[in-house]
């Protein structure tokens, strides 16, 4: 009897220690949590894609992923937060290339160092930039745009861009130099207000992300003149590229993933491999493409090389334009 009682108590003790009986919240504590920083507000294209990525990463690693929006200063606040992240926070940043390439070029003190404070994980998509005019504009193509600006630069030469110091800002400069015309970049607080003014013909032209124009073009509200790339943009395959007009520039922009420099090396390796494997899933690749951006995986080394090339090119345009760092 004593023996049976002892065995019963031992059995109960073993069951109590079993993970199957541990309450849910305790189990959740053992599940890793990854924080994905996004430098833009909820609901915009970058945020939507970041949430798709975070969900896929969580499933791949059996982890909880938390998307944290830190909008402001063109993504600068999110990049600074990545630098300040602790190793225990398991922090990643879903970055637009403006944060990685342009901010260090146009900001006196960005508050982070791309080479020291973050590790490249992968490029996820390319996104394209378009030159567009209102649908009511008499301008029908790039040649017509150039001729119109030459005739009346004061009326036709203002070009809306998403931000001061952005790639579209300096693409305006490149266009002006190439065609020897007088263009003036008019900075907005993001692409959305620039597009609103474009559709209302409050501004004669704009250079903004193509994905933000797809539906407006279908609705007959804007006319897209050219895509800043050397290859055509699938949702607008009838629109010529700047490459077709003789431009040589690394104009494709990208969205990619960076890890905090102090993230545990084993976790960085796991995140990197999980991200690579995402592109083996046609369903997930199609989901990424639904954002009107182009799925375009590149690993850490290729992403690092891409950033170096783009930084060299845009850095030269910044210097030539005599832009004063803010």
Language model region names:
Residues 1-13:
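N-terminal secretory signal peptides and thylakoid transit peptides that target proteins
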């Amino acid at each position: 009897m004593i023996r049976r009682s002892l065995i019963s108590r031992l059995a109960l003790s073993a069951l109590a220690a079993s993970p199957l009986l541990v309450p849910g919240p305790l189990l959740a504590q053992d599940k890793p949590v990854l924080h994905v920083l996004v430098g833009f507000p909820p609901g915009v294209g970058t945020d939507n894609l970041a949430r798709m990525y975070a969900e896929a990463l969580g499933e791949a690693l059996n982890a909880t992923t938390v998307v944290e929006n830190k909008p402001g200063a063109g993504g600068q606040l999110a990049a600074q937060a990545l630098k300040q992240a602790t190793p225990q926070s398991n922090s990643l940043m879903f970055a637009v290339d403006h944060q990685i390439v342009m901010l260090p070029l146009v900001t006196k003190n960005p508050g982070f160092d791309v080479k020291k404070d973050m590790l490249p994980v992968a490029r996820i998509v390319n996104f394209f930039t378009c030159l567009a005019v209102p649908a009511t504009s008499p301008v029908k193509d790039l040649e017509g745009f150039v001729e119109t600006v030459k005739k009346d630069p004061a009326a036709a030469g203002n070009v809306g861009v998403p931000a001061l110091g952005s790639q579209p800002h300096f693409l305006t400069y490149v266009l002006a130099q190439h065609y020897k015309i007088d263009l003036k970049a008019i900075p907005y607080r993001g692409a959305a207000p620039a597009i609103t003014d474009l559709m209302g013909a409050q501004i004669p032209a704009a250079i903004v992300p193509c994905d933000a124009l797809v539906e407006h073009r279908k609705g007959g509200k804007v006319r897209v003149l050219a895509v800043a790339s050397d290859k055509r943009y699938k949702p607008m395959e009838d629109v010529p590229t700047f490459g077709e007009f003789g431009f040589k520039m690394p104009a494709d922009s990208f969205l990619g993933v960076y890890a905090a420099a102090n993230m545990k090396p084993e976790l960085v390796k796991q995140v990197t491999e999980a991200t690579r494997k995402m592109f083996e899933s046609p369903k997930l690749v199609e989901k990424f493409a639904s954002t009107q951006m182009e799925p375009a995986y590149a690993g850490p080394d290729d992403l690092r090389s891409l950033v170096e090339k783009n930084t060299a090119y845009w850095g030269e345009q910044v210097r030539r334009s005599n832009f004063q760092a803010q």
